[in-house]
């Protein structure tokens, strides 16, 4: 059985036991949360709606992404860095 969940304007195909990195969620560590499922597939039949239970494992920053801008013939350079927050979750169960 697997489900499609949506969090942070992104969709993920998950099954029980999966560990995902999603955009930052406002929950603490070891907290159990319910995420809405767009659809659930079980034994070849598709059901729309439902809930997916997950556990928050940690919240941290991702790797640094460097943004480099260079304007030719202007002697202008800019180097910026960005680290996005993410939440690591574990899928506990997929509800009906």
Swiss-Prot record:
Family: Belongs to the bacterial ribosomal protein bL21 family.
Organism: Hydrogenobaculum sp. (strain Y04AAS1)
Annotated TM spans: none
Function: This protein binds to 23S rRNA in the presence of protein L20.
Domain of life, source organism: Bacteria
Signal sequence annotation: none
Record keywords: Ribonucleoprotein, Ribosomal protein, RNA-binding, rRNA-binding
Family matches, as InterPro entries: bL21-like (IPR028909), bL21-like_sf (IPR036164), Ribosomal_bL21 (IPR001787), Ribosomal_bL21_CS (IPR018258)
Protein name: Large ribosomal subunit protein bL21
A Pfam family per the record: Ribosomal_L21p
GO CC terms: cytoplasm; ribonucleoprotein complex; ribosome
Subunit structure: Part of the 50S ribosomal subunit. Contacts protein L20.
GO BP: any one term: translation
Annotated GO MF terms: rRNA binding; structural constituent of ribosome
């Amino acid at each position: 059985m697997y489900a499609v969940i949506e969090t942070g304007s992104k969709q993920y195909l998950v099954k029980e036991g999966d560990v995902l990195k999603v955009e930052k969620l406002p929950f603490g560590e070891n907290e159990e949360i319910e995420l809405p499922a767009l659809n659930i597939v079980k034994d070849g039949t598709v059901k729309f709606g439902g809930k997916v239970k997950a556990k928050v494992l940690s919240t941290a920053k991702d790797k640094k992404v460097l943004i480099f801008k260079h304007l030719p013939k202007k002697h202008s350079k800019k180097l910026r860095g960005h680290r996005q927050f993410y939440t690591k979750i574990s899928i506990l169960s997929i509800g009906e």
